Structure formats: C-alpha cells, structure tokens
Amino acid sequence: MAETILILGNGFDIAMGRKTKYTDFIEFEKHLFSNPDEELIEFLKAKNIRIDNYKDNLYLKFINENRDKLGENWSSLEIMISQLSEAVMYCKENTDLLYSTAYNEPIRQQIESNMNKLRKDRNYCSKLYVALLFFSLFYERKWRDLEREVALEKVNNEFLRQLDLLIELLEIYLSYLDYLDFEVSKIKAKPTALDAVSNISNSYVLNFNYTNTSGHLFGTFEEKTHFIHGRIDLDRQTNRINTMVFGIEDKENDVNSDLIPYQKYYQRVVKETGNKFEEFFIKRNYTVKNTSVVGRAVPTRVLVSKNIVIFGHSVDPLDKEIFQKCFELAKKGEYPYRFIFTYFNEQVKRSIIKNLAIILGKEKLVELTGKRNVVFVKSDDKDGMEDVLLP
C-alpha cells in the first residue's frame, strides 16, 4: 500500500469548518477590545494574558483605516505586511519627502503635499500611512536630535516590534479557537476528498498551519508532523520563543538587509523550524510483491509508492523553496510518486497551476502533468481522489 504525505494549508482548517481566515482574526481583534464575551475573558485569565500590549497594532490599524481603498488585498495580512515593509524602505530612501528643507524636521502639511504627488504610484496608501506615522512618532518620541537615517530606522524597528505583537495576538486567537472547537464544541471532520485516503492517521504531515487540526480530527501523529511555520503554544515555558513564522517572500536574489527580518526564510532560521519534512520524502520503504518468472511466482522487493496530497494550500510562491525541495526529493527517491493538488473551484485551480508554473517552470510542469506525477482533484471529490491515488 502506498504511503501518504499530507501537505496542509489554511484551506484545510477552513474545510473542517474552522474560523481561521484572516478576516476572522481581524474581527476577533475588534471584538477583543470592544466587547469580549465572558468565555473569552475567562480564557485570557486562565492563560494569564494581558491584552493591553496588543491594542492599536500598526498593521491591523492600517487595514481598518484603509479597507475601502485596498480592494481584496485587505484580507491578506501577508500582503499588508509586504506593502508596509516596502513603504518603510521607500521612506528610508526618500527622506526629503518627510523632512522640511528649511527646518530639517517633518511638517504634516508638507508631507501630505509631497505624498499627494505619489497618489498614482503603486502602494500609495502604505507610503502615506508610514509617512504620517513617522510624523507622529517624531514629536512623540523627541527625535529632533537624531540623524534622518537613525530616525527612520527607529520607525522600521517599531514595525518589526509590532509584527512580533501581531504574531502573538494571532497565537492567542488560534489558541482560543482550539479551545472552542476541540474542548467546547468538540467538532468532527467534515466530508472531503481526503476521505478516500486509507489509513490517513498514519500519514506524514507537512503542516503550513499553526494549528494541529489533522491531529485532533484524523489522529495523525505529532512525531510524523512537521510544523514548517511553527505552531501555537501558549503553555510553553517563558524561556522558549514563539516559533510562529509570519512574514513576506524574499523576492530578490540580492539580499536586502532592511527587509530580511520580515522574510519567512529568515524567521524559519531564527525560530529554528527546521527541515524535518525532508525526511518524509527521503525515507524509502519496500514491500514484497510476487513476480512471475518462468511460470512461477518469485517474491521481489519493490519500492513503496508515495501519494503527496496538497490540501487547502494556494501553492503561493511565498513558499516556493519548500515546494521546490519537495519535488526535488521526490524525484531523487526513485519511488513511484504523485503530487495530488486539491482545489476548491476552477478559479483556485487556475491559480494553483499559475503558481506551479512560477515555482517549477512551465516546461517542467507540462512534463510532470504529462507523466501524471502532478494531478488535480476537486477538494470535495472523494471518487476523483480514489481514481488518482497510487496503489
């Protein structure tokens, strides 16, 4: 029987009926500071959590103030982090837009006038937000004696500090959600194409989520699970770091030192999330099959196939290094393998194919689909999944 490697994205948790969309988190933050219910208050007390530090987070404040102008992007925190970090870098490189030449300090009217000239530029909202925040902090924190570069570096450090707080707040939300779903409501797995996977509890799991939903609902084992982006753990010892990776893609070959702390690969190194998932692909198991030789059955040792099922992941190029490594190791393993990408609808399928073309290259993708090493199945199509699973 073939082995299974599950690669799970947030769409998996959503398919299981969990409120893990970024929009759910953003609504939770509003609820937390305006009208928290008694159950939430008791949860925070039990976990000894003080929420004052998380109020008016710069990233969530930006989203709430600019939601109408941002289109669909407002609902993706990672896009917002990317845009704001780029805006900080832009302001660092263009300090004349922020400082009055006459007084060498920021004047709000002049900043607004300068920024208004950029209204048609990409990422205008983020640039204006960072510029006006700089104006406020400059006088609140008495930066008059600082050189321009030093003052702008302090703004960058504030955004990095706020990113850490945002990650902590996300951990609080997901931990509370775990409590509601698994201790209070005791939810069960919803029907999906994964129902076709036999012995799913014994699967290896490459988990891009911070939650262990597959463990709760399918009984997958933690020792066979790699939380590649870290995991929630409010009960960790005080000397242990938050391992959750939450950031942006490294878009350039040349390392931009200012953007490094925002990038996922950097956070994976700092938080030591490791490369345990590679073992799932490297490990080769054998089974014995009878082969007919001169009219008689001869036991022969053959490699066990691997079904690599990607469920609820957009295959965003943010995670391209991980997917490239998965494909590379599967090929090196010399066992029969098949990547089975599930999709919610045709629009999502097209997006996954586009992302795979970016990650693998067009020719390689055509080759793999031609060999049936890559196939696509609708996420609710159990029969379709049964048809494509390697035996």
Model-derived features: where do they sit?
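Extended amphipathic alpha-helical scaffold segments
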Residues: 68, 288-293, 309, 358
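Extended, charge-rich low-complexity interaction segments
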Residues: 255-291, 365-391
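Active-site catalytic pocket residues across diverse enzymes, especially alpha/beta-hydrolases
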Residues: 29, 218-221, 330
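Extended, H/D-rich, highly charged conserved domains that either
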Residues: 39-283
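Active-site-surrounding "flap" and adjacent substrate/cofactor-binding loops of secreted or lumenal enzymes
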Residues: 27-41
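A conditional alpha-helix N-cap/helix-loop micro-motif detector
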Residues: 186-187, 207, 287-291, 316-319
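SIR2/sirtuin-family catalytic core signature
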Residues: 1-25, 41-47, 296-391
